Amino acid sequence: MNSQFAGLTREACVALLASYPLSVGILAGQWIALHRYLQQLEALNQPLLHLDLMDGQFCPQFTVGPWAVEQLPQTFIKDVHLMVADQWTAAQACVKAGAHCITLQAEGDIHLHHTLSWLGQQTVPVIGGEMPVIRGISLCPATPLDVIIPILSDVEVIQLLAVNPGYGSKMRSSDLHERVAQLLCLLGDKREGKIIVIDGSLTQDQLPSLIAQGIDRVVSGSALFRDDRLAENTRSWRAMFKVAGDTTFLPSTA
């Protein structure tokens, strides 16, 4: 699935990634069924797999480390979200493990510019070649949006968390919408070339209004695996973007 990214420039990769409106939180499923999940997602041409890497220090939860990135099939786009105390070391390990997209927490590192600049020089393998590492910045619900201003030129993905990581407390829908509006206002004419992502316990009925506001992608885990209906739920969630945005380049198998 990721062969279409081989040899593309950073700008072309971002444009292509923007046509995939869903990143599947693969760790939310039953690990014993991982092979079945991956087969279903491949059949749906759903390349983006989202992995939350937590170390129990940035937030009170442990998940997996960079080793998990390497274990996933090479055919997928591995979308890694770092929620760790040492983002620099973790970012290096994730690139070595084959992560295609790496999102840092704005609150997690005073040396964000250094890490993002380094990531901007890295490439990772895809089927048939290589692609540049796509860089993201993520913000907790209470983090002021203007902290991203100094690094806007160093990121392609801006991710707003709708939950407090490791705690599960959610933003009210009205507050989330206001935050999206504030982000769009902040970006202004720098909106082009940025993928805006919402991550955190969204329900399907929240999607239409968020899509109408102009977001590009959502990250979903538990909701997609609900009732052991990953394929059906993935189709349904992707269809929401098709109806609302008429995304021309959305994969046809949905």
From Swiss-Prot:
Keyword Transcription regulation on entry: no
Record SUPFAM superfamilies: Ribulose-phoshate binding barrel (SSF51366)
Cofactor note: Binds 1 divalent metal cation per subunit.
EC number(s) given by UniProt: 5.1.3.-
Broad class of where this protein is predominantly found: membrane
Chain segments annotated as transmembrane: 14-34
InterPro entries: Aldolase_TIM (IPR013785), Ribul_P_3_epim-like (IPR000056), RibuloseP-bd_barrel (IPR011060)
Residues the record marks as active site: D52 (proton acceptor), D199 (proton donor)
CDD domains: RPE
GO biological process terms on file: carbohydrate metabolic process
Residues noted as binding substrate in the record, renumbered to the chain: H81, G166, Y167, G168, S169, D199, G200, S201, G221, S222
Subcellular location: Cell membrane
GO molecular function list: metal ion binding; racemase and epimerase activity, acting on carbohydrates and derivatives
Residues bound to a divalent metal cation: H50, D52, H81, D199
Cofactor(s) required for function per UniProt: a divalent metal cation
Bilayer topology term: Single-pass membrane protein
Cited Gene3D superfamilies: Aldolase class I
Record's keyword terms, sorted: Cell membrane, Isomerase, Membrane, Metal-binding, Transmembrane, Transmembrane helix
A cellular-component GO term for this protein: plasma membrane
NCBIfam families in UniProt: PRK14057.1 (NF010658)
Family: Belongs to the ribulose-phosphate 3-epimerase family.
Name of this chain's protein: Putative epimerase LsrE
Annotated organism of origin: Salmonella paratyphi A (strain ATCC 9150 / SARB42)
